[in-house]
């Protein structure tokens, strides 16, 4: 399509070509285009198919009030293409079609519209009940518009938190005037505008502002002034998300191509707020009013003046306000063949505009409206009808510009809990009373005259400044007096539609809701707009009432024969603008801690996994089954990085008392050179951590905790000893020391090669602790433990030497087949041994007794007041608690997923960990089950989502599946 390239109002650069891919085919647009205008320029007229009937939908508005132009863009679904700037290389895919938008197989649904009356989904499909799962699957597949694309790249998000004296919402003439006025009083002002540029509805209009100055030039003047005002911070392409108490505003800004973000979340705390969001158009309701080729006045006008695209060749206008007459004159002058202008008003038109239409031979039919658009995929003919009488006229055309009135963009004010009432003169919903320090201005109040619009903005800016402590009451009175002498709000048409059957007269494009549906709902008793909205789903689609928000209350009021005062709009809730969850999350720098061995493991092919604040090696194998790692530890020797374990030194005269307070075991009996396994509980006796403690000297202890508790252990101990006045100190050494667990039957042989210390079973037994040096150089602290069920040495090394020791061990173990192993292998190995992991075999209600760890409780330390001991004693024999059991699957190759539930007629427990054991050749696991199922030999019935309706079966066994006597730990 040829562009109108010489217009002074253009926002495009016709010489700068950009490419996009649509349905696998390359198209060209130009810089400044939106995706929708670029596609329109390339002859695309059907942009989508409707959600229920799969009717063709085309470009209708450029403001995002309808879901007609939702598409998948660069793997992101539900993008409003009419508001999305074109960027080079964009990949666009249509949504909600089987086939193509032009030939959609599901278009057959339109033939069965009679079978889908209002609320049909509430009344069928649930009887007989056993058919519901079948229908549910079909409905879920059919529902929705866009689909999540797993290949979508992660978006770039940002966040900004601001405060100001005055926040102005809306960058049109009223908003700019308010911002300039407030800034002129020395206040900091933030100006938000949804479009990529300022100017509002002045921006594309050529009608005169004053003699010799068209409106678009006045827009340029205002924009230059506000951009040159240092106290005004402007955020273009920024849409409101929410408006909350005490003037807290949230917004979403779309990033420019050169910005470092795709979307930015903005939160603003303002002393005063001015809302100058202007008006949108109220759709005319008639048969096939959503066919491609039907569009709003502003859409047709801006296509030409802003993007250089004539919206059609032969056009008919059906309007209800003077902007429609103005657009018809303007577009006719640009080359559009305007066949006729139908105006729903019988009088009240601007005589100057009527005279211009007469001069250019465009007939005007007063008291007429469009009653039907003809054509299956695009309009080919329009029928106009007299509102009073039975006269009809047909016009062959490819464009119908239709709008019956204006409605203010009231959603931001609605969120402030302001009571909105219907004004019968302006036809708008206006606030009866505004919250403190909130003001409205401009077309929002129904002003149409440019000077009135700007003056109302000036008045709102002064009122906001006065709220901020500025002395300007006398000036505000003068401005108010001037405004009263200017043209006030114009009288608007209340017309919605010509009475008829209404089967294809759409009131809500998003949800395929027709006038017939609204009437059906009304007859069933849903006799107010809010109830009708819920029952028919009108206004609940992607645009949340954008198209239907004003007409629905008017239609219901007509059924009720209500007076204007009882016309109530439907509720508006945030977010006002669809916003990615990633945008709410803000920047995603993904901060994490890494161990001293991170790069070394990375170079060895480790696949990492986020564990709390750390990144740890999940596996080194070809897949996460880690079979080779498991078998190597069982048969030879392996090493794992355990630097993330919490490491603490507790020392001082009262250190034992402090440890006794938080650990359930007897801390006073720990000898030097030995380690003790113990646990911490909360006040309810529920397990929160486990670890080992050793005594290094008199009143000097070294202890380890789980990775998850390493960051809070100091605070936990301090909190529970805060009133005792004890003399002790605690030092967090977690990041001071790295740690390596060397495990396997050949571990002693490997370790002995890098130290002269005697590592024999007699000199360094199981659960022993030693401090010595490696190669006479590196001091280490070593514990002989057995978490994975093999001979193991947990080596704690000064962090800067950890990589060196890792390399020494790999070198020393080369002849024994040493290999690193990760968390997946460790998880399987410890499961075979029956060792628990806090948070995996436990949850917040799980006690020591539930896990079979009651032996850790030392019952004779009466004066220690240990956290959780009282609860542990009282719950030891409590009925109805879940108990930890081991189980083996009846079918060795069937392994339930973690989190699967144990059932009979009800849920009786859940699977904590289950794996296929390559060591044992069968599937094993640990589960928490009700006590009557905890006896060995009991059969468990398991529901696993991956098994469908089939049940899996297992038998309860000991929790120790491998080396129950512990011989391999002590070898």
Regions inferred by a protein language model and the residue ranges of each:
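Short beta-strand segments
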Residues: 25-27, 78-79, 266-268, 393-395, ...
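Conserved, structured C-terminal
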Residues: 598, 602-603, 616, 697-971
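Acidic, proline/glycine-enriched N-terminal capping motif
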Residues: 532-535, 551, 558-681, 686
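Structural motif
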Residues: 22, 73, 611, 683, ...
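Residues forming anionic-ligand binding surfaces in small-molecule and nucleic-acid pockets
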Residues: 279, 526, 627-643, 687-700, ...
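Residues forming the flavin
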Residues: 2-590, 736
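A short, contiguous, amphipathic alpha-helix enriched in charged residues
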Residues: 35-47, 648, 653-670, 749, ...
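Short amphipathic beta-strand starts and helix->beta connectors
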Residues: 425, 490-493, 628-635, 680-690, ...
């Amino acid at each position: 399509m040829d562009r109108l390239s010489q217009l002074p109002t253009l926002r495009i650069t016709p010489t700068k070509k950009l490419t996009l891919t649509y349905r696998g085919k390359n198209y060209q647009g130009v810089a400044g285009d939106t995706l929708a205008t670029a596609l329109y320029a390339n002859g695309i007229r059907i942009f989508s198919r409707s959600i229920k009937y799969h009717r063709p939908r085309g470009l209708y508005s450029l403001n995002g009030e309808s879901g007609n132009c939702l598409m998948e863009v660069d793997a992101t679904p539900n993008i409003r293409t009419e508001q999305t700037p074109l960027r080079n290389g964009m990949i666009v895919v249509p949504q909600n079609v089987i086939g193509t938008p032009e030939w959609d197989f599901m278009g057959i649904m339109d033939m069965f519209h009679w079978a889908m009356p209002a609320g049909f989904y509430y009344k069928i499909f649930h009887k007989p009940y056993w058919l519901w799962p079948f229908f549910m699957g079909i409905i879920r597949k059919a529902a929705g518009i866009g689909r999540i694309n797993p290949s979508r790249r992660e978006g770039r998000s940002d966040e900004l938190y601001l405060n100001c004296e005055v926040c102005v919402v809306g960058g049109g003439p009223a908003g700019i005037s308010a911002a300039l006025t407030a800034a002129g009083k020395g206040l900091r002002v933030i100006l938000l505008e949804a479009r990529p540029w300022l100017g509002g509805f002045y921006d594309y209009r050529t009608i005169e502002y004053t003699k010799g100055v068209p409106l678009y030039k006045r827009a340029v003047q205002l924009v230059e002034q506000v951009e040159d005002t240092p106290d005004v911070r402007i955020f273009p392409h920024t849409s409101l998300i929410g408006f909350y108490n005490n003037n807290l505003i949230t917004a979403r800004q779309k990033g420019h191509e050169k910005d470092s973000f795709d979307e930015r979340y903005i939160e603003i705390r303002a002393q005063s707020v001015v809302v100058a969001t202007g008006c949108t158009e109220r759709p005319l309701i008639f048969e096939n009013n959503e066919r491609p080729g039907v569009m709003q006045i502003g859409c047709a006008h801006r296509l030409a003046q802003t993007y250089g695209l004539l919206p059609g060749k032969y056009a008919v206008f059906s309007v209800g306000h003077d902007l429609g007459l103005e657009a018809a004159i303007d577009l006719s002058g640009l080359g559009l063949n305007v066949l006729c202008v139908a105006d729903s008003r019988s009088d009240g038109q601007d005589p100057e505009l009527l005279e211009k239409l007469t001069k250019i031979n465009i007939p005007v039919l007063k008291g007429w409206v469009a009653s039907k658009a003809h054509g299956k995929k695009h309009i080919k003919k329009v029928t106009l009808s007299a509102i009073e009488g039975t006269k009809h006229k047909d016009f062959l055309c490819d464009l119908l510009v239709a709008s019956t009135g204006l409605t203010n963009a009231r959603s931001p004010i609605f969120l402030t809990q302001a009571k909105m009432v219907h004004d019968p003169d302006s036809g708008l919903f206006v606030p009866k009373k505004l919250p403190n320090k909130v003001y409205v201005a401009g077309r929002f109040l129904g002003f149409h005259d440019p000077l009135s619009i700007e003056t109302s903005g000036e008045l709102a800016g002064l009122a906001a400044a006065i709220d901020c402590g500025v002395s300007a009451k006398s000036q505000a009175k003068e401005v108010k007096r001037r405004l009263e002498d200017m043209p006030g709000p114009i009288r608007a048409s209340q017309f919605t539609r010509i009475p008829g059957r209404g089967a294809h007269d759409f009131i809500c494009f998003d949800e395929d809701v027709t006038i017939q549906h609204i009437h059906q709902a009304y007859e069933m008793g849903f006799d107010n707009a809010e109830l009708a909205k819920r029952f028919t789903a009108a206004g609940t689609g992607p645009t949340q009432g954008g198209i239907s928000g004003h007409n629905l209350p008017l239609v219901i009021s007509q059924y009720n024969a209500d007076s204007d005062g009882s016309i109530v709009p439907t509720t508006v809730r945030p977010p006002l603008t669809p916003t990615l969850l990633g945008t709410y999350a803000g920047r995603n720098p993904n901060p994490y801690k890494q161990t001293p061995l991170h790069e070394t493991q990375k170079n060895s092919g480790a696949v990492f996994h986020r564990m709390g604040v750390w990144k740890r090696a999940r596996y080194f194998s070809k897949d996460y089954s880690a079979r080779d790692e498991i078998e190597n530890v069982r048969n030879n020797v392996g090493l794992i990085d355990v630097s993330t374990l919490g490491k603490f030194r507790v020392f001082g005269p009262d250190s034992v008392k402090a440890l006794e307070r938080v650990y359930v075991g007897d801390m006073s009996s720990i000898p030097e050179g030995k380690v003790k396994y113990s646990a911490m509980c909360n006040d309810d006796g529920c397990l929160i951590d486990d670890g080992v403690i050793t005594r290094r000297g008199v009143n000097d202890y070294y202890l380890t905790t789980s990775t998850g508790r390493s960051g809070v252990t100091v605070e936990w101990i301090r909190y529970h000893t805060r009133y005792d006045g004890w003399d002790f100190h605690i030092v967090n050494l977690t990041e001071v020391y790295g740690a390596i667990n060397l495990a396997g039957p050949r571990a002693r042989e490997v370790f002995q090669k890098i130290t002269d210390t005697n590592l024999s079973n007699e000199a360094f037994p199981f659960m022993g602790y030693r401090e010595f040096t490696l190669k006479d150089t590196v001091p280490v602290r070593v514990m002989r433990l057995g978490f994975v069920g093999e001979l193991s040495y947990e080596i704690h090394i000064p962090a800067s030497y950890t990589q060196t020791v890792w390399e020494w061990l790999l070198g020393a173990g080369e002849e024994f087949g040493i290999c690193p192993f990760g968390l997946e292998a460790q998880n399987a190995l410890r499961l075979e041994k029956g060792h628990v992991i806090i948070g995996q075999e436990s949850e917040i209600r799980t006690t020591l007794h539930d896990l079979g760890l009651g032996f850790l409780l030392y019952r004779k330390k009466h004066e220690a007041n240990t956290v959780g001991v009282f609860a542990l004693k009282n719950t030891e024999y409590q009925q109805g608690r879940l108990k930890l059991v081991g189980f083996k699957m009846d079918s060795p190759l069937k392994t339930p997923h973690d989190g699967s539930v144990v059932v009979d007629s009800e849920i009786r427990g859940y699977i904590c960990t289950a794996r296929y054991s390559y060591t044992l050749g069968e599937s094993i696991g640990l589960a928490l089950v009700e006590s009557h199922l905890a006896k060995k030999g009991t059969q468990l019935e398991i529901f696993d989502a991956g098994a469908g309706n089939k049940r899996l079966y297992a038998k309860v066994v000991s929790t120790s599946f491998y080396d129950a006597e512990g011989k391999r730990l002590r070898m």
